[in-house]
Design a protein with these regions (language model features):
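Glycoside hydrolase catalytic-domain context in secreted enzymes
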Residues: 1-392, 408-853, 867-946
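C-terminal tail/sorting-segment detector
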Residues: 393-409
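Family-specific functional microsites
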Residues: 856
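Acidic, Ser/Thr/Pro-rich low-complexity intrinsically disordered segments
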Residues: 863-865
């Protein structure tokens, strides 16, 4: 444990700082920023009234106590004066143009309709204000990609008109982009605002962080974690993006700056790592040592001097240019980065940075170097560059090797089976820019099932109950195999089924329970572990308050591992407070293309930055015995058809890019939990992909944690259709947990676990192996500590804090009941995040229940997660969960757990997501306990001394 004490105030301060350090200043002509005290501001853009704290879907569904948006932050600072007349005009317009939150899961619009801004209106505001701030907002998320169209990646006509009129009237204009990931930026050159900032989606303290940068309380130090090209078509992945059945990774390892620095530097509007400051820095570097051998590293020394007039931080990056050799290489690869402390004008800091050779070694999937399936350093000169972005980084040194060096010997894995061609460099011009050539991608030569057959775990025969508990394993009294030998085949099959969503066996409103999900498994001392959606905070669909974090892109743009680690110590404490063992995050897929809807959750186009951000979060959360589940393993590069679109990708691209961030999180971040993705890679769905989950993850990386599926994911036997019932394929691959089923014991999902065990398609030892992975995870969890009575003073203090916190409230209506009462359906606000409270007055005291019929809305996406939590007073009675495919009316009965000993009680209905339809809502008295209650109260009065 560390000395960090859970405090919402300190949590908020740290998040606020992370927001500020993640903001990227793109333009600042005439030093319009920072704002001077007394500035009179005209605030344009309807997004000022609907700040996007995060993207949509499971990654953003956090119930917050508050959200401090940009307008609220500016209004609360007496250094600045907002144009009240303009604000009133917006508020009047908004009465007829309310916020459109969509019809439910994945149906939220990308943007909100913009109020028309005429030149006359702008000129009127100019009479009162001397500076204009324009806010443009965007969102996207799970099951909903961005699109290369107006209102998403491109500006709308109304937004362009607003920019045109405001920028032509005001001499000083500032544009704030409240977005989850990068958007088209051609408009900057056209309308020429004075300043532009990516302020991202900053969670509940987002507006506060923006205020700090605008005011100059924080000097901007964020750097782009992605390359911004002039046009969406300039990204080579765009040509293959968005197909329903297949996503061909023809650009191979040339993603983001790796592509542009090699083939098309002229197409870059803003380079990777770009970001301005209110001050200036002088950066000098030197390569101090370089060992280009297996296990070797490069050490560089970077001197950063503040040569400006303002105190500030600087983020510096180190890149490698490897020789083209036989394989072909990107012109630049990020190998290290660091961030200074706050430097006063004239102050210098020297950063010592190290890069292992694994950061720039190349994987040979062709055998062209004579070392097939190896990471190698080819002979030639290795040049190293340092600076503030990939384009401007200057040469700081070089070293050469005369012969090829093998840095890691591996084996063929996850190879494609479908022939395709990939990009490679051909000839370079006088400026070092290469033309594009194409080559055939090597195809698979080894069947993964042959590897499985030669790598089966030793059989563990069933012994029956020997009296061993899981605690005996911790104490060293028995081995894990001896303990698990007690479990029958049926019990092992129960073990690999997680339950949810909103299982009553764990914290209310969370994503799922796993491990000890049956009475029999709990008899053996196996606790039920709890997982909750992230990564933007803890999602609890019962309405419990949690802290909403800045989005992943914002955090990555800070280039500050230490600060992100500090922030996630608070996340770790909050997880432990809420009895959640693992947060379902961070998301660490790469920003292969700007249109991926979940880019807001993910960090960057670069695997090193991605992996180190993930490692910082994991190490900090794990100080409190909780962790994060890194996801989505792997290649979740688009949301459209994410269950079906086959990622056709080379081994080299997987090894150097798409798996690299996960590898860093495993090796450096000590990851203990991983979520596989929905779709297939090279024809095999990831949830049952043996090469991915066993050959690479466990055998090569040494991973010993759990792997869980995404919710209701599918798996397949190669060449066969995928099914969410094929848990046998999952266990065979070491995907330990199928998430989720309604009831593990009854096999409510009707999976094939027992069937395939009986016919020999999968062996008992493979189920034991997954059960062992699950148990090892649980032995390190707070759930286990609670089960064995080892709660700490920290747990007791966190529990005290939890009891003080309040949940979301909403509209309240009164209802009287004798034997039954109808609930007016118009009372119920079924919108996302809304609750309705019924104050129920009964004629008699007793036990009560609620009955209703429900279904998913007709336009709900099939994988939508639609939840309704029903409370009696402050206690959760039940969470009703529908999938978007549940389109038929279903009767639900919710029994209130506590007998009523007063004549009034409260029923709260909280909707974690919109998209559920209700009808025939009634509350019934299940049993009258009036006479019994009166008798008990009479006895109590008689026994109570006066």
């Amino acid at each position: 444990m560390t000395d960090v004490i859970y405090s919402v105030e300190n949590y908020a301060k740290t998040a606020r700082k992370a927001v500020a350090e993640g903001i990227v200043l793109m333009k600042n002509d005439g030093e319009v920023l920072p704002l001077k005290a007394g500035a009179k501001i005209a605030l344009f853009g309807r997004s000022q009234f609907c700040y996007y704290k995060s993207g949509t879907g499971s990654g953003g569904m956090v119930n917050t106590a508050y959200v401090n948006g940009i307008r609220e932050a500016l209004e609360g600072d007496d250094r600045f004066v907002l144009n009240r007349t303009l604000s009133d005009t917006y508020e009047e317009w908004l009465k007829d143009h309310p916020f459109d939150q969509g019809a439910g899961w994945a149906q939220e619009p990308w943007f909100q309709e913009e109020m028309p801004i005429s030149r006359e209106l702008v000129e009127e505001t100019r009479k009162e204000s001397d500076i204009a701030v324009i806010i443009i907002g965007r969102t996207a998320g799970e099951d909903k990609d961005n699109a290369a169209e107006e209102g998403s990646y491109l500006l709308t006509a109304a937004e362009k008109e607003m920019l045109q009129n405001v920028c032509s009237v005001y001499e000083r204009t500032i544009v704030l982009l409240n977005v989850g990931n990068i958007i088209d930026m051609k408009w900057v050159d056209k309308y020429d605002p004075s300043a532009v900032l990516y302020v991202w989606q900053g969670g509940q303290e987002g507006g506060s962080g923006v205020l700090d940068v605008l005011s100059g309380d924080e000097c901007p130090s964020g750097r782009l974690s992605d390359t911004i090209a002039y046009d969406i078509k300039d990204y080579p992945s765009t040509a293959y993006y968005g197909d329903t059945l297949e996503n061909k990774y023809a650009e191979d390892i040339y993603v983001g700056y790796r592509y542009f620095s090699t083939f098309a530097p002229e197409k870059v509007q803003y380079p990777f790592g770009f970001g301005l400051s209110y001050t200036q820095f002088e950066v000098n570097g030197e390569v101090k040592a370089a060992s280009l051998t297996a296990g070797g590293k490069v050490t560089v020394e970077i001197s950063v001097k503040n040569i400006g007039r303002v105190a500030g931080k600087n983020a510096v990056q180190v890149y490698c240019q490897a020789p083209q050799g036989e394989l072909g290489k990107p012109a630049r690869v990020l190998i290290a980065y660091g961030k200074t402390e706050v430097l006063m004008p004239g102050e210098t800091q020297v950063l010592q940075l190290e890069a292992p050779v694994s950061a720039f070694a190349s994987f040979d999937d062709t055998g062209r170097t004579g070392q097939k399936s190896c990471f190698v350093l080819e002979a030639g000169e290795y040049r190293f560059y340092a600076g503030e972005n990939v384009r401007d980084a200057g040469l700081i040194g070089s070293t050469s090797i005369d012969t090829l060096a093998v840095t890691e010997q591996l084996s063929e894995a996850i190879a494609p089976v479908k022939a395709f061609r990939r990009m490679k460099p051909a000839c370079a011009d006088e400026k070092g820019v290469y033309s594009v050539d194409w080559e055939d991608v090597p195809l698979r030569t080894i069947d993964p099932m042959e590897k499985r057959a030669s790598n089966l775990p030793k059989e563990v025969p069933y012994t029956g109950d020997q009296g061993y508990k899981l605690s005996f394993v911790e104490e060293g009294r028995v081995t894990m195999e001896q303990f698990l030998a007690q479990l029958s085949d049926e019990e092992l099959c129960c073990m690999i089924r997680g339950e949810g969503m909103c299982s009553p066996k764990v914290t209310a409103g969370t994503a799922g329970a796993f491990g000890g999900v049956t009475e029999r498994l709990q008899y053996f001392g196996i606790p039920a572990g709890c997982c909750a959606d992230g990564p933007s905070g803890i999602r609890m669909d019962c309405g419990t308050i949690a802290f909403a974090m800045p989005n992943g892109t914002c955090l990555a743009c800070s280039f500050n591992d230490a600060l992100i680690g500090e922030l996630y110590e608070y996340e770790g404490l909050e997880l432990r407070k809420n009895k959640v063992d693992t947060l379902l995050g961070p998301g660490i897929n790469l920003h292969r293309n700007p249109l991926n809807g979940r880019n807001f959750e993910y960090f960057s186009e670069d695997p090193l930055l991605t992996g180190r951000m993930a490692a910082a979060q994991l190490l900090s959360m794990q100080k409190y015995d909780v962790t994060g589940t890194i996801k989505h393993f792997a290649c979740n590069s688009q949301e459209h058809s994410r269950n079906f679109a086959n990622a056709v990708v080379s081994q080299r691209a997987l090894r150097e890019l798409y798996l690299k961030g996960f590898e860093i999180a495993v090796r450096e971040g000590q990851a203990r939990s991983i979520m596989s993705s929905y779709g297939p890679i090279n024809g095999i769905w990831t949830a049952g992909n043996y090469d991915l989950l066993t050959t690479v993850l466990r055998n090569e990386w040494g991973y010993a944690g759990i792997v869980m599926t995404d919710w209701w994911a599918k798996a397949n036997d190669e060449g066969q259709p995928a099914s969410f019932q094929n848990t046998a394929a999952m266990v065979r691959a070491q995907n330990d947990l199928y998430m989720v089923t309604g009831d593990s014991l009854s096999n409510s999902n009707e999976d094939n676990s027992m069937e395939k065990l009986a016919d020999g398609s999968v062996f008992r030892s493979e189920y034991v192996r997954s059960a062992a992975n699950i148990c090892r995870f649980l032995l390190q969890s707070p759930a286990y500590l609670r089960m064995v009575g080892k709660e700490t003073d920290l747990d007791r203090e966190l529990q005290r804090l939890a009891e003080q916190e309040m949940s979301v409230t909403g509209n309240m209506f009164k209802l009287e009941i004798f034997e039954e009462a109808d609930v007016d359906e118009t009372w119920i606000d079924k919108a996302k995040g809304k609750s309705t409270t019924l104050e129920v007055t009964a004629k008699e005291r007793g036990l009560f229940r609620m009955e209703f019929e429900c279904r998913a809305a007709a336009d709900a996406a099939p994988l939508a997660q639609i939840n309704l939590s029903v409370f009696q007073d402050k206690q959760l009675a039940e969470t009703v969960t529908l999938a978007g495919s549940d389109k038929e009316w279903t009767k639900k009965v919710v029994h209130f757990p506590d007998p009523l000993f007063s004549y009034t009680f409260f029923v709260k209905l909280f909707f974690g997501m919109s998209g559920m339809e209700l009808r025939n809502i009634k509350i019934y008295m299940t049993k009258s306990m009036e006479e019994e209650t009166r008798l008990k109260m009479k006895i109590h009065r008689e026994e109570t001394p006066e």
